[in-house]
Amino acid sequence: YMLKKMPEPEQNDTVLNTDADPDNIQVLYLWEEENVPAKTTFTKDMTGYFDDWDFRPYVTAIPVRKGVTPKGAVVLMAGGAYQFRGNYTDSLPTAAALREYGFQTFIVDYRLSPYTQEEGALDVARAVRFIRKNADVYGIDPDDIAVMGFSAGGIQAGEFLMHYDEDVNGTALDSSYVPDELDQIPAHASADGMIYSFYGRLSVGNMDPDWLSEGDLPPTFYVYGTEDPFYDQFEEQYDVLKNMGIQTSRIVLSGWPHGFGSDGGWVKQYAEWLEEIFKQE
């Protein structure tokens, strides 16, 4: 179940060639077929990966129910150590809950190994640009967008916020990438949810205030359990961010391990926090 894949787009529908639909679930490729920024070469003969060599990252847009006034948008990335995306345990049930709390939700199926977290960060940025472009369609303020991720998905959100947000586009990684209409829109997110995750890389949180300050990071909400092998790192980074003056909040689940997904009753409090952050904007 953890390894189950989300449905892919049925046609060649992309965030560039398709109108946003505020009333129905939409599944859209994030990039045009011949214009995907990458530094990694993934060829047909490379097997044993979760995704096939010709995988195209995509976003699943799950809008609020009809008649609901949206409070903002949330972009979700599942965990899986860059070996898989646990959407059915992480992002899908969380998106379903956030939708009931009035948030437009967008699940990003970002690139995994053999790609890097830099390439995945561009996938996140692309989804944010699409939402900002269509803020009116989705009934939100273009600044009321949060990113969040579980484990590796949170590292992915962090990589985006640290190095690939605002005006950075695919050319930062790939000189052959041709910027398009969406790249004119800054990839700006106003909040981050780190669900048993941190700013850094797989298994290693970065505790250097000088490094972290380069990212001009938004308010950040941590959720983690005391039995998580990375518990001490979550605690330390939370304190570092707080001491830097970044707005931080957290839920610590006593006795909980790594990888609990949407369980633990944290989503409601996180939704309330997001609402407060968006009001400050």
Name each model-derived stretch.
Residues 87-106:
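Short amphipathic alpha-helix adjacent to the substrate-entry channel of hydrolases
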Residues 70-79:
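Short beta-strand element of the alpha/beta-hydrolase
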Residues 235-281:
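C-terminal catalytic histidine-bearing segment of alpha/beta-hydrolase fold enzymes
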Residues 86-88, 108-139, 260-265:
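Catalytic nucleophile-loop/oxyanion-hole region of alpha/beta-hydrolase
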Residues 2-68, 117:
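N-terminal cap/lid segment of alpha/beta-hydrolase-fold proteins
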Residues 126-215:
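Primarily recognizes the serine-hydrolase "nucleophile elbow" in alpha/beta-hydrolase
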Residues 216, 221-224:
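Short beta-strand/loop motif that positions the catalytic acidic residue
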Residues 200-201, 226-232:
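Acidic catalytic loop of the alpha/beta-hydrolase fold
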